[in-house]
């Protein structure tokens, strides 16, 4: 089976938990976009493990693959590999030599660019991801393959300084070069042709799971530009981000929260002007710790994401959190400047007048003390109001919700 897990909102949907749950059935798990701006948390028997570069499925899959579509901070990757080795024996990692390298210069540039944007700040994670992708498309990148040569590292850093030095200020090139070279010497055993590895695995009949980072609404082309990430996040970017043919993908799983959250600026039609959901769901970014904006489930966004990713099944997370509210709403459509929209439109002018049409549902209450009973009995034992909510979403999206998450832990999951 060749599967892709993608986020259908603004990231933070719970892809990490779903991927970790699924990965016992897969031989390889692959990251194909983003960098350490993607934070995901896996909870196993109450123990939290947080990754930013290593895919969430690493705890169960045989081989971890980091594709060419990523930009990688070698020092932070080393830290995560050490963390992974403490949690798991016999790890196997393949890192594409074509992946770009995130350096200290990129982090400095990221912060400086945000300062220069002033009131139009995007709200980046300040991890250097955007500037690293800028260099990729400007053909200036240090590649993972380059980390075995101190000369190549220095030459490319000097080139970056020559072109962008006014923004970075003084940087100790020797120190940065030596840090990258040292990290590279430890990582080089893992660096190779990830595309060829995946081709070989496919021909051997291995099961491969591609794990997307961020979400559809943060895609550089299809998201709420300019308040987006710097890479393509939709399922189709599996091919360009890993070198694996998308025609071989059999299964696209769209993951979404039972409500909507967003970090940073930009349009958010169903946003709620209270802290109730944030507090109930502990909605703070894994990478930055920033409070997430919260709102009701947005069906126009989910319809748009389902179409973009061609999802064939869905996974819903945090239903246990949503039930703690006294009343629950779902945004079913928009009226924008007098025109009706059931799907998120190609463009929304920031000055437009937006009205959201809502469907209201009765709560199913706080189920925290009853979750273990539901897990043992299956979908039909879930509260009636919760099942009504799930089935309304299925009917609205014309797609089955096969995976239902009722908590952070891997075990707190029901498969229909």
UniProtKB/Swiss-Prot annotation:
<feature type="binding site">
    <location>
        <begin position="39"/>
        <end position="41"/>
    </location>
    <ligand>
        <name>GTP</name>
    </ligand>
</feature>
<feature type="active site" description="Proton donor">
    <location>
        <position position="40"/>
    </location>
</feature>
<feature type="binding site">
    <location>
        <begin position="11"/>
        <end position="17"/>
    </location>
    <ligand>
        <name>GTP</name>
    </ligand>
</feature>
<dbReference type="GO" id="GO:0004019">
    <property type="term" value="F:adenylosuccinate synthase activity"/>
</dbReference>
<comment type="function">
    <text>Plays an important role in the de novo pathway of purine nucleotide biosynthesis. Catalyzes the first committed step in the biosynthesis of AMP from IMP.</text>
</comment>
<comment type="pathway">
    <text>Purine metabolism; AMP biosynthesis via de novo pathway; AMP from IMP: step 1/2.</text>
</comment>
<dbReference type="InterPro" id="IPR042111">
    <property type="entry name" value="Adenylosuccinate_synth_dom3"/>
</dbReference>
<feature type="binding site">
    <location>
        <begin position="318"/>
        <end position="320"/>
    </location>
    <ligand>
        <name>GTP</name>
    </ligand>
</feature>
<dbReference type="InterPro" id="IPR042110">
    <property type="entry name" value="Adenylosuccinate_synth_dom2"/>
</dbReference>
<dbReference type="GO" id="GO:0000287">
    <property type="term" value="F:magnesium ion binding"/>
</dbReference>
<feature type="binding site" description="in other chain">
    <location>
        <position position="125"/>
    </location>
    <ligand>
        <name>IMP</name>
    </ligand>
</feature>
<feature type="binding site" description="in other chain">
    <location>
        <position position="290"/>
    </location>
    <ligand>
        <name>IMP</name>
    </ligand>
</feature>
<keyword id="KW-0436">Ligase</keyword>
<dbReference type="GO" id="GO:0005737">
    <property type="term" value="C:cytoplasm"/>
</dbReference>
<feature type="binding site">
    <location>
        <begin position="405"/>
        <end position="407"/>
    </location>
    <ligand>
        <name>GTP</name>
    </ligand>
</feature>
<dbReference type="InterPro" id="IPR018220">
    <property type="entry name" value="Adenylosuccin_syn_GTP-bd"/>
</dbReference>
<keyword id="KW-0460">Magnesium</keyword>
<dbReference type="InterPro" id="IPR033128">
    <property type="entry name" value="Adenylosuccin_syn_Lys_AS"/>
</dbReference>
<feature type="binding site" description="in other chain">
    <location>
        <begin position="37"/>
        <end position="40"/>
    </location>
    <ligand>
        <name>IMP</name>
    </ligand>
</feature>
<keyword id="KW-0342">GTP-binding</keyword>
<dbReference type="InterPro" id="IPR001114">
    <property type="entry name" value="Adenylosuccinate_synthetase"/>
</dbReference>
<feature type="binding site" description="in other chain">
    <location>
        <position position="214"/>
    </location>
    <ligand>
        <name>IMP</name>
    </ligand>
</feature>
<keyword id="KW-0479">Metal-binding</keyword>
<keyword id="KW-0547">Nucleotide-binding</keyword>
<dbReference type="GO" id="GO:0005525">
    <property type="term" value="F:GTP binding"/>
</dbReference>
<comment type="similarity">
    <text>Belongs to the adenylosuccinate synthetase family.</text>
</comment>
<feature type="binding site">
    <location>
        <position position="139"/>
    </location>
    <ligand>
        <name>IMP</name>
    </ligand>
</feature>
<comment type="subunit">
    <text>Homodimer.</text>
</comment>
<feature type="active site" description="Proton acceptor">
    <location>
        <position position="12"/>
    </location>
</feature>
<dbReference type="GO" id="GO:0044208">
    <property type="term" value="P:'de novo' AMP biosynthetic process"/>
</dbReference>
<feature type="binding site" description="in other chain">
    <location>
        <position position="229"/>
    </location>
    <ligand>
        <name>IMP</name>
    </ligand>
</feature>
<dbReference type="InterPro" id="IPR042109">
    <property type="entry name" value="Adenylosuccinate_synth_dom1"/>
</dbReference>
<feature type="binding site">
    <location>
        <position position="12"/>
    </location>
    <ligand>
        <name>Mg(2+)</name>
    </ligand>
</feature>
<dbReference type="InterPro" id="IPR027417">
    <property type="entry name" value="P-loop_NTPase"/>
</dbReference>
<protein>
    <recommendedName>
        <fullName>Adenylosuccinate synthetase</fullName>
        <ecNumber>6.3.4.4</ecNumber>
    </recommendedName>
</protein>
<dbReference type="Pfam" id="PF00709">
    <property type="entry name" value="Adenylsucc_synt"/>
</dbReference>
<keyword id="KW-0658">Purine biosynthesis</keyword>
<feature type="binding site">
    <location>
        <position position="39"/>
    </location>
    <ligand>
        <name>Mg(2+)</name>
    </ligand>
</feature>
<feature type="binding site">
    <location>
        <position position="292"/>
    </location>
    <ligand>
        <name>GTP</name>
    </ligand>
</feature>
<keyword id="KW-0963">Cytoplasm</keyword>
<dbReference type="GO" id="GO:0046040">
    <property type="term" value="P:IMP metabolic process"/>
</dbReference>
<feature type="binding site" description="in other chain">
    <location>
        <begin position="12"/>
        <end position="15"/>
    </location>
    <ligand>
        <name>IMP</name>
    </ligand>
</feature>
